[in-house]
Amino acid sequence: MEKKITGYTTVDISQWHRKEHFEAFQSVAQCTYNQTVQLDITAFLKTVKKNKHKFYPAFIHILARLMNAHPEFRMAMKDGELVIWDSVHPCYTVFHEQTETFSSLWSEYHDDFRQFLHIYSQDVACYGENLAYFPKGFIENMFFVSANPWVSFTSFDLNVAAMDNFFAPVFTMGKYYTQGDKVLMPLAIQVHHAVCDGFHVGRMLNELQQYCDEWQGGA
């Protein structure tokens, strides 16, 4: 199981078409960037309710499918080398009302939604009441999802002091709301410019919207 979870391919930076971009955005122009969209979840939410699924794991699974579909969202520095993980797994926040704190919990990704939902449900049942920051422990090949369901927003930025080798995407979901006949949800994503450009984020967000429009409840 460990081999499956942590497999990767090394990138030969000297032969990589993004060599100059990577070196620039990891050194003299080191930066991450954030983008916030108002995602139309009208059809997705309707299907979630129709199939009596929970919104959070269903949406996390869609994000995980997209992260695993594109190598730019699976990159990391490991032992001084740039690598592409064979797969990445969602690490998501679980809120604790009694302490007003949260935990970060990860679940192994599977293409099949129902199999992923089973794993997610087991993880939440086992670790959901644990107040530790990482109750299940930590793995290297994760991307991050945070939920802020108490407020809607039009912009959201993460300000981390040292992001030089942190390439994992970070998503933040806001409170969804009705606008006309649509249900919209704020969604922010932070990526590292060394491995991911605006084109890549734009393509992913367009695919995400299509997934939400066409999602069939994991069938």
Swiss-Prot record:
GO molecular function: chloramphenicol O-acetyltransferase activity
EC number: 2.3.1.28
Keywords: Acyltransferase, Antibiotic resistance, Plasmid, Transferase
TM region(s), chain numbering: none
Broad EC category: transferase
Source organism superkingdom: Bacteria
PANTHER family in alphabetical order: CHLORAMPHENICOL ACETYLTRANSFERASE (PTHR38474:SF2), SLR0299 PROTEIN (PTHR38474)
Subunit structure: Homotrimer.
Family, as annotated: Belongs to the chloramphenicol acetyltransferase family.
Known role: This enzyme is an effector of chloramphenicol resistance in bacteria.
Annotated protein name in UniProt: Chloramphenicol acetyltransferase
Annotated source species: Klebsiella sp
